[in-house]
């Protein structure tokens, strides 16, 4: 049996990377939005949610933007794999892939960086207070999954960089 044509292999690789990005972003979203802790400070218990940390709100926004773009690109890629034709005629789809992948990858990495930085900053302040260590660990886990989603999108960005000069 002959190997598939390179164009089909690259289309399938792009589809797999987009699906992996989607999975990592969904996992990051679930971990982040379910992140709560109870702080015990001088006989007072305070319930802390992820939305109380500004950087986690930014992480949430980057995850939602990344998910919206990834779902759109999965639909475009599925159509391309199934039919061999792009949704948009001309070079519009390639340019959209090129610029979209670049912008989204930068958005995702800034969200991950904000998550890591804020988690590192608040860790020494509240360490050992109630179940705050679990809150910290979930923050790191969510930021890590977001970073892995960025890596998948960055690889897709390289693929779209190679595809654009071939068509333009």
Swiss-Prot record:
Subunit structure: Homodimer and heterodimers.
Any one GO cellular component localisation term in the record: plasma membrane
Segments in the Cytoplasmic topological domain: 1-11, 79-97, 166-168
Pfam families: CASP_dom (PF04535)
The keyword Secreted appears for this protein: no
Domain of life per record: Eukaryota
InterPro entries: CASP_dom
Predominant subcellular localization, coarse grouping: membrane
Residue spans crossing the bilayer: 12-32, 58-78, 98-118, 145-165
Key words, A-Z: Cell membrane, Membrane, Transmembrane, Transmembrane helix
Organism, as annotated: Ricinus communis
Tagged with keyword Transmembrane: yes
Bilayer topology term: Multi-pass membrane protein
Family per similarity comment: Belongs to the Casparian strip membrane proteins (CASP) family.
Localization in the cell: Cell membrane
Segments on the Extracellular side according to the record's topology features: 33-57, 119-144
Descriptive protein name: CASP-like protein 4D1
């Amino acid at each position: 049996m002959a190997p598939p044509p390179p164009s089909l292999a690259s289309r399938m690789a792009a589809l797999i990377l987009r699906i992996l990005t989607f999975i990592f972003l969904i996992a990051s979203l679930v971990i982040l939005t379910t992140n709560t802790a109870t702080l015990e400070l001088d006989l007072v218990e305070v319930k802390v949610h992820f939305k109380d940390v500004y950087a986690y709100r930014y992480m949430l926004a980057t995850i939602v933007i990344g998910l919206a773009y990834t779902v759109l690109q999965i639909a475009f890629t599925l159509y391309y794999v199934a039919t061999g034709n792009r949704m948009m005629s001309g070079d519009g789809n390639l340019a959209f892939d090129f610029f979209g992948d670049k912008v989204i990858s930068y958005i995702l990495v800034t969200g991950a960086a904000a998550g890591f930085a804020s988690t590192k900053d608040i860790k020494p302040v509240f360490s050992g207070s109630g179940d705050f260590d679990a809150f910290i660990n979930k923050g790191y886990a969510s930021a890590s999954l977001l970073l892995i989603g960025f890596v998948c999108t960055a690889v897709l960005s390289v693929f779209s960089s190679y595809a654009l000069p071939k068509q333009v």
